[in-house]
Amino acid sequence: MTEILPHVNDEVLPAEYELNQPEPEHCPGPESDMAGKSDACGGCANKEICESLPKGPDPDIPLITDNLSGIEHKILVLSGKGGVGKSTFAAMLSWALSADEDLQVGAMDLDICGPSLPHMLGCIKETVHESNSGWTPVYVTDNLATMSIQYMLPEDDSAIIWRGSKKNLLIKKFLKDVDWDKLDYLVIDTPPGTSDEHISINKYMRESGIDGALVVTTPQEVALLDVRKEIDFCKKAGINILGLVENMSGFVCPNCKGESQIFKATTGGGEALCKELGIKFLGSVPLDPRIGKSCDMGESFLDNYPDSPASSAVLNVVEALRDAVGDV
């Protein structure tokens, strides 16, 4: 028997704790053994709260590990800056993988304050149901399932205004309680930059194993500056970097097939950055205005425009990504 989950509210998702102010720089973390004790805690308005929180191993992590044990490959989609097409690429990656009928694919939207995967995957009006086996994800196709906070909002344009503790609790629920069953791939779309969501997902999934991160950028230096920070975060957090994809890399006219550079790579672009930092360059994807149209319609751009240079480029990136995780 299944039932529809109620909309997200304080009763359904109570905060584990509420801090008096956002965590300061060099904060050891409210749940760490050094919470309230480190040098960074001196004078912090949260000191007493952090000291009172329970310490020790998180009892939910074994449950998360068990729930995700049937998932073969787990991929984080990251970007240093917003607006580079990270969520768009996460959606196209999900469409591309699920085009193989032998693969079972899940898409988890962890951009909690700006969820967009449901719209791009064409299931914006769906709701989440709960059964004895947990939360049932929304199925886009027979072999593509998705989960997002968007399905739990009272209105499509309802704002999510949460601090880190409540975000962490929702991430735990998605990892621990969603009945993904057996998947070949779980694509995890994250917010831009490095935030609570990134730290939490790495902490909660460390034991279950993350194959690595796919980093999305655009060619211009202003985007690459933040990508360098994202890559540094991955290295410090012990997250394997599967590779980098340069999105919006030129514009190919659908009529004359001529190519123009809209966002010029003033410092060499993504490929040069990969050579500099010693990470894998998965490929470049050119601009195609029809990508945005397909996302707005909740349809697969790859199916709608298979002859587009952008479609070929995306499929090449997906092939390189599958090779990077050993799925050949």
Curated annotation (Swiss-Prot):
Binding site for [4Fe-4S] cluster 2: 253, 256
Keyword 4Fe-4S recorded: yes
Tagged with keyword Iron: yes
Biological process annotations from GO: iron-sulfur cluster assembly; tRNA wobble uridine modification
GO cellular component, one term: iron-sulfur cluster assembly complex
Subcellular location: Cytoplasm; Nucleus
Residues the entry annotates as binding ATP: 80-87
SUPFAM superfamilies per the UniProt record, alphabetical: P-loop containing nucleoside triphosphate hydrolases
Cofactor note (record): Binds 4 [4Fe-4S] clusters per heterotetramer. Contains two stable clusters in the N-termini of NBP35 and two labile, bridging clusters between subunits of the NBP35-CFD1 heterotetramer.
Superkingdom: Eukaryota
Entry-linked Pfam families: ParA
GO function terms (MF aspect): 4 iron, 4 sulfur cluster binding; ATP binding; ATP hydrolysis activity; ATP-dependent FeS chaperone activity; iron ion binding; iron-sulfur cluster binding
PROSITE patterns (UniProt xref): MRP
Alphabetical list of CDD domains matching this protein: Mrp_NBP35 (cd02037)
Similarity-based family: Belongs to the Mrp/NBP35 ATP-binding proteins family. NUBP1/NBP35 subfamily.
Protein name: Cytosolic Fe-S cluster assembly factor NBP35
Originating species: Saccharomyces cerevisiae (strain ATCC 204508 / S288c)
Gene name linked to the record: NBP35
